[in-house]
Amino acid sequence: MIVALLGFAGCATPAVGDPCLPEQVPEGGFQQTEAYIESSSVQCQTRVCMVYKLEGAPEGTPTCVADRTKCATAEQVDKAVYCTCRCDAGNSRFANCTCPSGYTCTPVLEQGSEGVRGSYCVKSFSVSAAE
């Protein structure tokens, strides 16, 4: 019976919300009107690192080092850059996750390959602020 319960507990959404930093930061930093998905992120148990509507570049990245006016604060990065999972892949053959409490399944990518298109778990306060 314990094995069955442990197996069920393993189905929870792993590490959504954990901090991460994408390996690639666009020249000039991120744009607040965009969301960025880095799949195959080794920093995330979910393998997906998302930048959701962040303006600028995280501290220590080449863009921020070259131009301090392009830097995002640590608080801004904490709110907008984190591990996530895809919660709705549409009619795709790919699996979906269930968003944990405090996150909303939100359409993020409408273009791109079938492997990344769809909705992702986004911090609920970010979705409310955008509406």
Regions from the language model: what does each represent?
Residues 1-10:
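Sec-dependent bacterial lipoprotein signal peptides
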Residues 11-131:
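Secreted, cysteine-rich disulfide-bonded mini-domains of extracellular proteins
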